[in-house]
């Protein structure tokens, strides 16, 4: 006869089962005690340094440089160590070597006459910097970061104290041997990369890796190799994610933006997407159309792009019209999206070349619509249907794009709570009075935290679910909605005036009203309300986001609501630097507090290497702690405290003889 256990007995049984598993890892009192001591020691170390970046918009050169120079921290560490013993020119050279070791070494090898002496001096300096940068981490953590080829040697050099003559000789012998056997170059590269890694413990990318910049792929490749990173998706990221999932409207939007900024090398050369069908279609229907409103924004110093302007303009117009047609499919299918107001092709008077919007009649600046039937303006022609199918096929079957988007899903999310900070790219949907805006999704109302979590899960369904399933179709529609919808936390505006910006000259029609979040984000009580919604304590938490460039040159502060919100979109994208007056922000959160670093314009990687020009950065202390924050004060610290509690309970179980020790 089976004896049923009551609830308490069941819980005790589960608990004992857990401790038996834990006992396999720590089979006796000695090992469990050692681990408790180790974990307690870790709790008292200074917290690791976090760096926050947002709105990179494909500008890979300044992004990679900021990672390499630790937003100016690497040079400050060198100055702290060598300000009294090195000239400023030597400090600049040493910093450049750490940022770009391979390239700088090639130059040094051509110019330096006594290379062995240079190697010896440089290796000693790099070891000292490396020791300084890694001093707040455990040996175990540093060991995991070491390059395999030099792990033992670097560990010896970092952690041994060379006080006696014998130890000094031992130290010098290691350095001399590295030089004698021809491994100094590789060792310098390894040390430089280790220094870069030790400067940043955790990297947060708060959205918009993609947009108009030339090489978001390089940014993602860099992040894929990074030791510790998370991503909060931006609206442009979601657009590419939707395109990779096969969302027709997202594909059209991605190509519209790519043609608008003549950034087709990314699409064709990097992601291998065949644009010949679009070019052929555009030439057929717009051969004699100057497409003046669709002339791409090309760089003045890019003659190749200028030569292709005529063709790209035609492609730009063709894909834009196709986008407007495709959007009707989703808008009709999802009335809960409330986007009927964006259906404008049927509002055009094709004979007069006008459109009435909000009671105002506007003259269109372009009335050539060869693929539109005025009686059925949203109907795709047979050629358009074939074209979009080919384009979607190319996106869905681009191996590199799929690899990048899978990475965005694996490391990304709609929001993140990390060490008492709330990270998201755009906004929390609010009305003009500051009330939370809800959205009906699949028959249920969602708002605030639940809304973002629902959008997150639906986006994943849109990408990962089986093709043709209801789950995938709905998720795909949501991915497009997140790009353009009025309750999208990634968009933050009441409408997207894409049609108006192309076809109406009157700029009043171009206005895109921001949601209540942006009108009220300076209010401390609004930030407190949002933080509480996400289960955070407003007295010690803050919101960190991007999306809207901070117009610093006009006196706007990135610090809002008495420090409760920090907006870090400072203009990595060159297009926004005229608005912001700077070239990006990095927020640094270390054991001493918060620092906001504003960056000046970055010329080029080549100039950084050849002329040793660094990004000029200005640091503003946002919050300084009287007592240094330790690991105990972090999310990891909370996890470690749970482990310590469990291990102490395991000790008690051993001492009571409930589980036998294995010695």
Swiss-Prot record:
Its EC number is 3.1.3.11. InterPro entries: FBPtase_class3, Metallo-depent_PP-like. Pfam families: FBPase_2 (PF06874). It is an enzyme of class 3 (hydrolase). Pathway: Carbohydrate biosynthesis; gluconeogenesis. The keyword Manganese applies. One of its GO terms (molecular function) is fructose 1,6-bisphosphate 1-phosphatase activity. One of its GO terms (biological process) is gluconeogenesis. Keywords: Carbohydrate metabolism, Hydrolase, Manganese. It catalyses: beta-D-fructose 1,6-bisphosphate + H2O = beta-D-fructose 6-phosphate + phosphate. Its cofactor is Mn(2+). Belongs to the FBPase class 3 family. This is Fructose-1,6-bisphosphatase class 3. It comes from Clostridium botulinum (strain Eklund 17B / Type B).
């Amino acid at each position: 006869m089976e004896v049923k256990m009551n609830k308490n007995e069941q819980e005790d049984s589960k608990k004992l089962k857990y401790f038996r598993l834990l006992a396999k890892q720590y089979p006796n009192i000695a090992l469990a005690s050692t681990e408790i001591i180790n974990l307690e020691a870790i709790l008292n170390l200074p917290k690791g340094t976090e760096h926050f970046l947002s709105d990179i918009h494909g500008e890979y050169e300044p992004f990679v440089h900021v990672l390499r120079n630790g937003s100016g921290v690497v040079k400050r560490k060198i100055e702290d160590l060598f300000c009294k013993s090195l000239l400023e020119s030597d400090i600049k050279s040493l910093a450049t070597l750490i940022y770009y070791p391979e390239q700088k070494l090639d130059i040094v090898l051509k110019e330096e006459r006594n290379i062995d002496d240079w190697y010896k001096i440089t290796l000693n300096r790099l070891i000292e910097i490396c020791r300084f940068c890694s001093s707040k981490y455990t040996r175990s953590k540093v060991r995991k970061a070491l390059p395999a080829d030099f792990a033992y040697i670097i560990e010896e050099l970092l952690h041994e104290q060379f006080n006696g003559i014998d130890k000094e000789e031992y130290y010098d012998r290691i350095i001399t041997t590295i030089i004698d056997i021809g491994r100094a170059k590789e060792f310098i590269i390894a040390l430089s990369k280790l220094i870069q890694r030790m400067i940043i413990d955790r990297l947060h990318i708060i959205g918009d890796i993609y947009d108009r910049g030339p090489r978001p792929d390089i940014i993602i490749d860099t992040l894929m190799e990074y030791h510790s990173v998370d991503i909060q998706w931006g609206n442009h990221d979601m657009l590419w994610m939707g395109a990779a999932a096969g969302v027709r409207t997202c594909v059209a939007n991605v190509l519209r933006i790519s043609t608008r900024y003549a950034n087709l090398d990314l699409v064709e050369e990097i992601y291998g997407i065949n644009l010949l069908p679009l070019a052929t279609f555009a030439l057929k229907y717009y051969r004699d159309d100057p497409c003046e409103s669709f002339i791409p924004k090309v760089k003045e110093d890019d003659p190749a792009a200028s030569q292709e302007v005529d063709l790209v303009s035609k492609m730009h117009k063709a894909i834009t019209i196709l986008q407007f047609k495709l959007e009707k499919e989703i808008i009709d299918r999802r009335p809960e999206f409330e986007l009927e107001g964006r259906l404008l092709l049927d509002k055009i008077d094709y004979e007069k070349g006008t459109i009435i919007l909000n009671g105002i009649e506007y003259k269109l600046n372009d009335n050539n619509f060869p693929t539109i039937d005025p009686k059925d303006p949203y109907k795709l022609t047979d050629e358009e249907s074939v074209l979009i199918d080919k384009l979607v096929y190319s996106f869905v079957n681009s191996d590199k794009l799929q690899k990048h988007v899978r990475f965005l899903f694996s490391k990304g999310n709609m929001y993140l709570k990390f060490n008492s900070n709330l990270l998201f790219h755009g906004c929390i949907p609010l009305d003009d009075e500051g009330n939370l805006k809800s959205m009906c999704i699949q028959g249920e109302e969602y708002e605030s935290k639940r809304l973002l979590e629902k959008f997150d899960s639906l986006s994943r369904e849109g990408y990962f679910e089986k093709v043709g399933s209801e789950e995938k179709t709905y998720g795909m529609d949501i991915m497009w909605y997140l790009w353009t919808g009025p309750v999208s936390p990634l968009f933050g505006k009441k409408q997207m005036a894409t049609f108006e910006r192309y076809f109406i000259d009157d700029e009043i029609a171009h206005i895109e009203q921001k949601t209540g979040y942006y009108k009220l984000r300076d209010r401390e009580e609004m930030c407190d309300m949002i933080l509480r919604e996400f289960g955070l304590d407003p007295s010690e938490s803050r919101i960190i986001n991007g999306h809207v460039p901070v117009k610093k040159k006009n006196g706007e502060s990135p610090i809002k609501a008495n420090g409760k919100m920090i907006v870090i979109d400072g203009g990595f994208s060159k297009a926004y630097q005229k608005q912001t007056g700077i070239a990006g922000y990095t927020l640094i959160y270390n054991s001493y507090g918060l620092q906001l670093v504003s960056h000046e314009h970055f010329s080029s990687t080549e100039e950084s290497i050849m002329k040793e020009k660094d990004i000029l950065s200005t640091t503003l202390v946002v919050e300084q702690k009287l007592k240094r924050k330790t690991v105990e004060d972090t999310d990891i610290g909370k996890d470690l405290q749970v482990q310590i509690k469990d291990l102490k309970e395991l000790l008690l179980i051993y001492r009571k003889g409930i589980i036998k020790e294995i010695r």
